[in-house]
Amino acid sequence: MDPDTNVGDEPRSSGSSLRWCSLSLAGSGLSKISDDIESKTVSEAGDIGDRACHSSRRSDFGSFRSSVGNGTGNPIPDSNILPSATSNSITPDAPLSGKGIYPVSTEELENSEDKKQDVEKVLTPSLEYVSYRIYLSFFGILGVLTRYLLQKLFGPSILGVTSNQSILYLDLPSNMVGSFLMGWLGVVFKGDICRVSDYLVIGLSTGYLGSLTTFSGWNQEMLNLSVDGKWVFTVLGFFIGLFLASHSIIFGIETAQGFRWLLTRLNSTSSSKNSNSSSKRGLNNHRCHLAILVALLLMLGVLWSVSGTQLKEKFNSGGSGAQLWLACLVAPPGVWIRWFLARYNGRGLGSAGILKWVPFGTLTANISAACIMAALSTVNKAVNTKTCDTLVTGIQFGFLGCLSTVSTFIAEFNAMRESKHTWRAYAYALMTFGLSFVLGTLVYSVPVWINGYN
């Protein structure tokens, strides 16, 4: 259940029912329900995976409406209404303090479901799932290419801002840019993009921004520093990286809010409504959707064809060119797995759903990618050939770079930091950094120290 634009107001369609439920509960029970909703919301602030599909979202929404209508739904206090789990797929995820919330009402949510009937008539669940994967693949490859360009631009060869043996690691600029754009596309304007196309918002936030940023590369750079005995640089690398990424998303949210305010001043309310309604009828029309899907599929085929051709030409010579084209070929599976794992965000552990505030999907994706990258780095050190270096680096940059993400992680971190339980943000960050670094040390650093690899 989503609140209206004014956080303190309730949706008309169920406001009286929610107030009646709220007044009928004891204070302790009300507080527990509020904490449960907040825990689930912050955990789903970045991504909810394939639960965003219309079929699963519609069933969740229908069951929620039924429970509220019967007076059995989870009550929500008037003073602390938070977006529900269902809302994450169709509304902007924002800090819970109210600084950046742009939720939509239940009436708008129902209208949004009605506007999608044309798409649902022609898209079976399997075709819908394939459509999401096509969007994720296309935007995931674009994210890899953008990350490569930023790495080269700020790296030693051009601007010289970042390097391999510095706390300003090579992927820092892409993590900052991705976190900044997450504030725009994944928080403030997420609801607006959803009203244009649900596939587009997932393609941009999960596909593009999730692949533009990478946690596994960040963790591996810190492991390389620790192997060389630069422990102070290692600690500072994690600290400064988190500080810059977290403030990048804050800067993104605030600038996006300013831009939204400017648009509101420039456009009248009536013209804004007309614009929104026309956009809903546009891309959510099934013919338009299928046309865009075919176009994306063709462009994806072109990208894969070019990548395969270039890889064949440059593989024997090695170098960053061959590694990039291999990365483009293996990037989509990394995005798909991360999107699949995101379904476990907000679920908690066990049947009781304990620790719902921990995004276990994102946590699993980041830690597993970091461990696999560390293992491949160990193999690369042991084999030490040009062919192995091309294969390992390409897989690390493409598949593992897309499997892990900083933009989603930092969106969850920011939501926790803005919630009532600020400590959860730092506990989540410590959990991610600690487990990834310790496991990476066992897989990579220890073998390097024992065998004396260069």
Where are these regions (language model features)?
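Membrane-interface helix-loop junctions in multi-pass transporters/channels
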Residues: 2-454
